[in-house]
Amino acid sequence: MRHHFALFGAKCVFLINAKLAFLSYNRINNDLEEVRKMDYATAKLAEEKVFKDPVHRYVHVRDQVIWDLIKTREFQRLRRIRQLGTTYLVFHGAEHSRFNHSLGVYEIVRRIIDDVFSGRPEWDNSERLLALCAALLHDLGHGPFSHAFEAVFATDHEEYTRAILLGDTEVNAVLRKVGKDFPERVAQVIDNNYTNQQVVSLISSQIDADRMDYLQRDAYYTGVSYGHFDMERILRVMRPRKDMVVIKASGMHAIEDYIMSRYQMYLQIYFHPVSRSAEAVLNHILKRAKKLSEEGYQFKFEPVHFTPFFSGEVLLEQYLALDENIMMTYFQFWMDEGDLILSDLCRRFINRDLFEHMDLNPEEEPERYAWLIEQVKAIGLDPEYYVKPDSTSDLPYDFYRPGVVPTKRPIYLEMPSGEIRELAEQSHIVSAMANNIKTDYKVYYPKEIHFSS
């Protein structure tokens, strides 16, 4: 009996030791995994990579994580999405992509952190990689010809950005190597709800890296001069403060110049009527193709890439498979479709035979709008696809008002005394522009209609 108890006791000791060894092994493995992630998060390339850039001269990449993200298929897809959509039909140089812009935003944030914020007690440099990743990936979910596409198919590029960050993607795999919660943290920064508002402000505010890059980049590629401002000065006077990024008061005039540049770019480039006309034609192409599909029309060139969007059941992989090159290929084939509306609209878009426009708000002048509809019908065209009301508006600067949440965080100045003041309180120029929303109403119609508008 004593012998059996001894054997039983020895067996228990063995099992306990085995269990402890297993737990210890798992703990060591987990610790090693954490070390590997820490090593990856701080890993530097053996040799710095640089991208030659017409706006910033060079884009510098030293972090392994950033380099790995750039090489993912989801980020490379941005090469095939134009930054300015249909604007290339007006300004022939505007062929730059969201890939270009995303690298530019990353470079501005890198410079702010490494050259200005680093070493300052108000800045937590452990947030550096997070800010760089959010800057690089902020436009990841944009689709082809974003705005027209979203209007017809009710997609949301912000939702797709989040889906790419958190889904079964190459980007997610890279981010997870930094930490299990790292993809979610990047998504929170881009969604503007991350706890550290300093990081959010770098990516999304009224003077963020996104705006500073696209204003200069779009001005460069369109060939205009009014999108330029003194970014070097602005970066030098940016300072991290509690829950915000502020501008030293000595840099106020550079900020005024930046806001004026943005105002002019919206009026002259982003709201250009010919670009909006092209977007109207594009909108009607997609709307007509969707309608034909719903009616069971047999396409000569079957729109397999569009089918999920027609039904509203789009998988992430299907969304990522559609880019502007593919869309243009469909439009070229559809020029020979049997449906005369679809073929004509595609011909107009491909050959830049766009709609004319008149200044008209249909709600204020319903009789004039009804008359235009009748003119379109009189030449044998369907107003549903050949008339497009459109309105554009922009707020140059959204200042702070008690009880009102601004669309973007206001710009704050740090006075020599250390006091923080909102920009519109100090700048007469910005105060005059603030909350001044200009809305421009137009209606687009075929060139075949001749009359004085």
Task: Identify the residue ranges that each predicted region occupies.
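Elongated alpha-helical scaffolds
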Residues: 130, 135-136
